[in-house]
Amino acid sequence: MKIKKALVIAALALCVQSASAQYNMPTQTFTYDKPYAVEKIKAPKGKKVKNVILMIGDGMSLMHVYTAWTANRGKLWLENATATGLSKTWATNKLVTDSGSGGTSLATGVKTNYHAVGVDTEGKPVPSLVDVAKELGKDAGIAVTCRLWDATPCDFCCHNIDRDKEEELVGDYPASGVNFVFGGGAEKFANRKDGRDIFNELRAKGYHVSRSLDDFFAYDTNSNIFAVPYDKDTPLPDERGDLLARASMKGIELMNRNKKGFFMMIEGSQLDDYGHFNQLDMLMK
């Protein structure tokens, strides 16, 4: 009996040590040496909205927003928003969602299974905001800092029951109807197991395929451009700087020529990665 009690006490001690070790992490701090300026924006009055820009911070929660607000001395461009709400994006078959299921909820308004991309719970494709824009005669585009086979961009342009079927997802882009695309992931567009060359298929559809930043920023013909200058993700924040902002502005410039307007999804894709890695400094950059 004494031995059993000793074993139980030892086991409890190990549990306590293990639990405390999980929270025995070094404190991280981050502050912008030079806070960026934030201006007050006034919405134009008396004009009908024709352009829609959806900006997604991958994996971003209210805590991320508050942390950024603190790091920038209590100022964020986000505070110019005239309304605040919460989007509940749980998966239909799992409490904790992922960018496949959660992003599909944002892109289509339809809840779906964990890891599903652009499909309902039965695996049937559902129309996204890209499709809605095209039906209205608008242009549609996406700009991301991740691989274009990653879940969020695919939620708007592709359809599959499993986000891990990366080559299959990339194979959906030529038929997606999206006009402007910027992101990484070139390695799965050519030299594929199925023998398809997605870049050539895009060219056959009338896209200008851009494989370098110089070519991308110099292009000025129309909005049908598929820019994939990187084999995988775009570079880390310190290296890429304001690349996402500049790429997004390029898309806006090209698609704004459509008199009926445009829809654009812009994703800060790498926030999620640094959240997983618990890297506060990279998360804030």
Regions found by a protein language model. Name each.
Residues M1-V8:
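Bacterial N-terminal signal peptides that target proteins for export
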Residues V8-V16:
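Hydrophobic helical h-region of N-terminal Sec-dependent signal peptides
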Residues A151-C157, D231-T234, G251, N256-K285:
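Active-site His/acidic residue clusters
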Residues G185-N200, T221-N224, Y230-P237:
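Acidic-aromatic/histidine active-site loop/patch
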Residues H208-S212, G241-N256:
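A Trp-anchored, charged/polar loop motif used as the substrate-binding/catalytic surface
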Residues L106-Y114, F226-P237, D272-N278:
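Gly-rich Lys/Arg/Thr-decorated short loops/hinges at beta-loop-alpha junctions or inter-strand turns
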Residues Q22-R192, I198-F216:
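N-terminal catalytic scaffold of extracellular/periplasmic and nuclease hydrolases
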Residues Q17-A21:
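Sec/Tat signal peptide C-region and signal peptidase I cleavage site
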